[in-house]
């Protein structure tokens, strides 16, 4: 069972604190303990309209153990990995818009590379956690556009489907499509200067913005893009 929503918590369980209100986040996978539709008692509660999953935990002696838990069928989950399409990438990305940015997982939130990693993990695609490692993917997947002019980059990106990955040193984002000739991206952003402004803002949000926003050095994100990563 794959979590395809941004996050949710399991129901409170008065008999098993290790799974009570446990938070599950996008891309997490849990094995099914029983076939979907199975009805049985789990710690005194019948499993109607729930998936029964195995949650890995640590036993008192330090060994691995699994605890059965119930996941309501109303939660945003998928049996098995989602089919990989770029439309599905955008659908998943949209579920994170407006959430707080958290560098390295601070504030129980995502930074730019964690966001991209978790979205793609829903398809069974395991990307590197760090931006620097992501940029080192083989040429088969990562096209180097660092030597192109700004307009050539714009045309190259315009030819790509929304959902591909764009990156430059220190930041990674998902191409979100275009509004006319304006390129848009979705990312967990820390800071940038808005279009037609030189003043850097503390953004700290997952949002859709123009690739014409600027870094502190004055470069636009479009000018800074070095790699286009396309899977499939």
Predicted stretch roles:
Residues 1, 59-62, 68, 77-79, ...:
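Aromatic- and glycine-rich peptidoglycan recognition patches
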Residues 13-44:
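Conserved beta-strand/loop element in small beta-rich adapter and peptidoglycan-binding domains
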Residues 38-145, 169, 186:
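N-terminal capping segments
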Residues 27, 115-116, 173:
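Short alpha-helical segments in extracytoplasmic peptidoglycan/chitin-binding modules
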Residues 1-15, 141-152:
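Short, structured beta-strand/loop micro-motifs enriched in basic residues and often containing a Trp
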Residues 27, 98, 162-163:
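Glycine-centered loop/turn motifs
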Residues 4-5, 33, 54-56:
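A structural detector for beta-sheet-dominated domains
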Residues 128-196:
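...with weaker cross-activation on analogous glycine-rich loops/strands in unrelated enzymes
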